Amino acid sequence: MTTKKLTLRQKILVAGTLFGMFFGAGNLIFPVHLGQMAGQNALPAIIGFIITAVGIPILGVAAIGVTHSDGLQTLSGKVGKGYGIFFTCLLYLTIGPLFAIPRCATVSFTTGITPLLGADSPERLYLLLFSAVFFAFVLFFSLRPGKITVWIGKIINPLFLFFFAVLMLAALLAPGAAVSAVEPVEAYRSDAFFPALIEGYGTMDAIAGLAFGIVVIDVIRRMGVDNDDAIAEDVLSSGLLTGALMALIYVVSIVVGAQSRGLFELSENGGIALTQIAGHYLGGVGLFILAFTITFACLKTSIGLVTACAETFSKMTNGKISYRSWAILFTVFSFAVSNIGLSAIIEYSIPMLMLIYPPAIALILLAFLGKFFAHDRTVYIATMIGTWAAAIFDCMKTLPAPVQTALHLDAPIAFAAAHLPLFDKNLGWLLPAVIGFAAGMAIRASRRQTPASF
């Protein structure tokens, strides 16, 4: 019996779905800013960024299919039922009201409103007013899901990509400086690969892939593919198409960001950099189109995230707290967080991402290695113990200095720096994760040994 697989046309359609899930206008702020920081060391920065911003997210989606899971809670539940609930909540809050949703509003404000304000304008007040209107629309459409997100997806997203292509082409044809002539900032001078690897965390796409992988799998199933192995294979092959497009966009963005240093000083964040580049090459009309398309693209992303988070938490509470209540709560909370500003949101998100990304990556890798240990829970638990224990130190290290001082974290951070390999690269969790995995495999092997007969 022949197992049905997707045709090339169907794979392209799935790739489009994946691209729509992963790539939002907010993603562009990271590669452009990365290019400005990396300068002449753009190549190793590109490689590092693509690993965590493209490769891991695609594997995250495929992990749901490989393990035949029906969602993130089922996959993370292989560690334990309680852990599955905990990790699902933490992940959705991170890509929801804590960081990703507020970031959408602030990216729109930074690229659309800030360039219009005078030097003495009360920016905080305008951010408050803008975010109030932005989240009023988010709540309205989250409570009344309909064709608005389809309209934005079919019209605004392609318009944005077209505009972005024109902007990037204009920048590449008339670069502000040669990439080789741009001095990198201190953090990227001696080693650009590892900082860029961590910079890719900011896209939050790896954890988003775990959260929304089931959506893509359902799309494939509706196309008539019902074999789990075939589904996983189709996700991977479609993901390669998506990854190639995302990688191309990121490479161009990083190069243009580096070249822009010949025109501008290092910007505070990528939103400001993108606005400066658009204004220089395309003038006032370019700024207007950038603001219009990014605002609507971020609006669509916010509506989708509020909807996904509200549905997930409503299901987890068995409907005792309604979808409507969760949607209102998440929208109001996101509105409040958005008013700390884009740079602050990015800064405060780093410690959380340093905490949640290591176990997310470990979970993805365990999903693919699971066939070698029959997805034994012991291996999952042992790996996660090592990963979480070390990730906590990585999180401590990236907390703002006043917080480190207030919590007296100097001693534990110094301990980790002395005993964890790669801790200086923000990858101190790698060796403990490997040790945990090895310990889990050893425990499993010892359990399988048959006692000798006498």
What does each of the following model-derived ranges do?
Residues I51, G55, L59-G60, L159-L172, ...:
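Selective recognition of specific alpha-helical transmembrane segments in multi-pass small-molecule
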Residues G71-G77, I249-L299, V306, P351:
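TM-loop-TM module centered on a large, flexible mid-protein loop between adjacent transmembrane helices
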Residues S142-A171, S349-I361, V379-A390:
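Membrane-interface loop-to-helix entry segments
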Residues A174, D376, Y380-F454:
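A generic transmembrane alpha-helix motif of multi-pass inner-membrane proteins
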Residues P97, I101, L161-Y188, A206-I207, ...:
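Hydrophobic alpha-helical segments and their helix-loop junctions in multi-pass secondary transporters
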Residues V66-T74, F134-I156, R222-V225, F335-Y348, ...:
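Membrane-water interface regions at transmembrane-helix termini and the short interhelical loops
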Residues L13-F23, A170-A177, E186-S253, G286-T301, ...:
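Hydrophobic, membrane-embedded alpha-helices of multi-pass small-molecule transporters
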Residues R144-I155, F193-A196, V216-L245, L263-T275, ...:
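Hydrophobic, small-residue-rich membrane helices and short re-entrant helix-turn-helix hairpins
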